[in-house]
Regions:
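Short, flexible loop motifs at catalytic/binding sites
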Residues: 1-239
Length: 239
């Protein structure tokens, strides 16, 4: 079921497209399968939802694809830092860029910072470490409750479910690049600061970064403060 969150919630009074598809797999027994994919299309109302979540990988209380994800074993994509070997999710919160007021210049400096040691990861890779392509080749899906240790072993009791569910954020997506993501994000921030219209930001966060949108969260974080908190001077790198 392609782009599931753009489907009607109820089809001719027979329920969701997912439930209808599941019903049609019954005759295939254990071989029956339904594949659903989408970027999150339904907004959430509570900007503090993470305060009440029961597990690390649990998604927000949203309908559509996120609800199906939460019903499964909640797998997330992880990278291993080239410097400290600790694992982490490549997420927008780790994305950094220069403090230039020119959006193009700022976006060209986009990079990721390891949440454990601060190691700078450049998308194309450089002499200081591997880039997105290499990290994706070595990446792993972890079920909710599992942990990837520096020695390569995976520990922890992962969630067990009849459904395998996966959430990949846009930072690791093969056909998206960080410069474009940052450009779109900063332009959306600029539009929001000028108009208080969240339409552009919602599109960037959902289809670009693969996140669920919360307008109340956006309204609580104005442009100047957000950019000052996120922008960092790249400076000179050291080995």
């Amino acid at each position: 079921l392609n782009d599931f969150d753009r489907w009607p919630a109820d089809i001719d009074g027979e329920g969701s497209g997912f439930l209808m598809a599941m019903a049609r797999t019954i005759t295939f027994g254990r071989n029956g399968m339904v594949l659903v994919e989408a970027s999150p299309g339904f907004e959430i109302d509570d900007p503090r939802w993470e305060d009440n979540k029961s597990s690390l990988h649990q998604g927000p209380p949203a309908t559509g694809i996120v609800s199906l994800y939460n019903q499964g074993d909640r797998r997330r994509w992880y990278w291993q830092c080239p410097s400290c070997q600790e694992s982490f999710e490549p997420h927008r919160s780790l994305l950094r860029w220069g403090n230039s007021e020119d959006i193009k210049t700022a976006a060209e400096s986009a990079h990721l910072a390891c949440p454990h040691c601060g190691h700078i990861i450049v998308e194309e890779g450089d002499r200081f470490g591997e880039g997105k392509f290499e990290l994706n080749k070595k990446g792993r899906w972890l079920r909710d409750g599992q942990k990837w240790l520096p020695d390569g072993s995976i520990v922890g009791e992962g969630v067990v479910s009849d459904s395998a569910s996966f959430w990949l954020f846009g930072i690791a997506a093969a056909f998206s690049d960080w410069k474009s993501l940052v450009t779109k994000y900063l332009n959306a921030e600029k539009d929001f600061a000028a108009t208080a219209d969240t339409t552009s930001m919602q599109g960037v966060l959902t289809t670009g970064f693969g996140e669920v949108f919360c307008s109340k969260s956006a309204l609580s974080s104005r442009l100047p403060e957000d950019l000052k908190a996120r922008a960092k001077d790249g400076g000179e790198r050291v080995v």
